[in-house]
């Protein structure tokens, strides 16, 4: 299992727009055959900080996700909404199998 944790910091005045843009990516991602989980989380202390927890069955599924129209549209719109570049960490999921 391939897991990615992405931190996204959004300009305060663009949070609602971010949620609209990212909702389309989320809804598309959870329909992908290789997707196991795709959670959008908001930091309760910093309302402009979001974390995306993505789990895919393998690297092939991750690469397929990055070619989907919903992902490409999201990335295209995201740049203008962010207050700083995204931070990404990749993991190998061990449990559950």
UniProtKB/Swiss-Prot annotation:
Tagged with keyword Aminoacyl-tRNA synthetase: no
Cleaved signal peptide residues: none
GO MF term (any one): oxidoreductase activity
Catalytic activity: (2S)-2-hydroxy-3,4-dioxopentyl phosphate = 3-hydroxy-2,4-dioxopentyl phosphate
One Pfam family hit: ABM
Enzyme's top EC category: isomerase
Subcellular location: Cytoplasm
Record flagged with keyword Transcription: no
Keywords recorded for this protein, A-Z: Cytoplasm, Isomerase
GO CC terms of this entry: cytosol
SUPFAM superfamilies documented for this protein: Dimeric alpha+beta barrel (SSF54909)
Residues in ABM domain copies: 2-91
EC number from the UniProt entry: 5.3.1.32
Record text on subunit structure and interactions: Homodimer.
Family: Belongs to the LsrG family.
Task of the protein: Involved in the degradation of phospho-AI-2, thereby terminating induction of the lsr operon and closing the AI-2 signaling cycle. Catalyzes the conversion of (4S)-4-hydroxy-5-phosphonooxypentane-2,3-dione (P-DPD) to 3-hydroxy-5-phosphonooxypentane-2,4-dione (P-HPD).
UniProt name for this protein: (4S)-4-hydroxy-5-phosphonooxypentane-2,3-dione isomerase
Species this chain originates from: Enterobacter sp. (strain 638)
Gene: lsrG
């Amino acid at each position: 299992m391939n897991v990615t944790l992405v931190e996204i910091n959004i300009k305060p005045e663009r949070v609602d727009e971010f949620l609209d843009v990212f909702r389309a990516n989320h809804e598309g991602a959870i329909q992908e055959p290789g997707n196991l989980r795709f959670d959008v989380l908001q930091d309760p202390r910093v309302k402009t900080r979001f974390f995306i927890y993505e789990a895919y069955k393998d690297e092939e599924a991750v690469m397929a996700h990055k070619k989907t129209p919903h992902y490409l549209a999201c990335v295209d719109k995201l740049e203008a909404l962010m207050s700083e570049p995204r931070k990404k960490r990749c993991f190998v999921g061990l449990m559950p199998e």
